[in-house]
């Protein structure tokens, strides 16, 4: 191209990337020659190698790609990420992680990005190790007690937030309680599980929420062994319904179900409304997140700012603060009481 027009290679490059550096007539002559020669322009991969950056940030999550477009909390989180990315003139790459760690590791190693938002990763330590080995920055969306001064995160106090909604339910007199969460243990079946305690839970977010629920009930004399932990095979309404199938049919069914997400809680409400015998047990149900559907269903829940979490995560990645402490962000949560919870029914 440069030889055909009689200019330097840098002048050809400027015609595409810095047109203000040459006259309009010269730029048009270069572009016209490119069209005649079939030259498509600078190779973006080669350009990124020369510049030392790609112009894209990655969002890691342990789920299928469709999760990013169907989960209501994820959609709002990614809205926040994309808003910040647009302000910084960069793009966003979704990096779903397969369940197998070998494939998941390759996904992190091969992602063409300048840094990562580590969002909703079940066991994130190995992912952080791979990112560090690549020499790339990252921001976690899970608050980490062991975070170093150079690590950045934006999250909530999962345990305290969960404790607040559980204390509300305990205050209504409920003592026979089920705790419902997604993927409590790797490869566990749907339905009730036997756990020695919250420390066995796989996912750090789920672990924080289940432990917070248990904290509140321990204060009223209900120990971990007296709580029914229920595993759902996915964060979806059908998965929640399948997980609680038969849960209310025994002689002493739970009078309340505390779910680790609004989506799961809505699935429990669906299951209660669709019982084959036409009866709807007087069960209190709570969620977590306060997605738009929660208000319409009258769901008691914990509100957390999804879009703010995404926006701040991307800002911390793209414009890191000079003060390391400013890179550790805890967002506020709020208990939202609605009609889905009430006093324990009298015998």
Which positions does each model-derived feature cover?
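Hinge/beta->alpha junction and helix N-cap segments in small-molecule ligand-binding domains
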Residues: 64-74, 95-101, 145, 154-163, ...
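Flexible loop/turn connectors
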Residues: 241, 245-347
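Residues within the alpha-helical elements of helix-turn-helix
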Residues: 3-4, 15, 36
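Short beta-strand elements of ligand-binding domains
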Residues: 93-97, 117-120, 135-145, 180, ...
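Short beta-strand-centered segments that line the small-molecule binding cleft or hinge
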Residues: 102-157
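N-terminal helix-turn-helix/winged-helix DNA-binding helices
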Residues: 35-69, 88
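Append "Primarily bacterial transcriptional regulators
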Residues: 1-4, 30, 283, 335
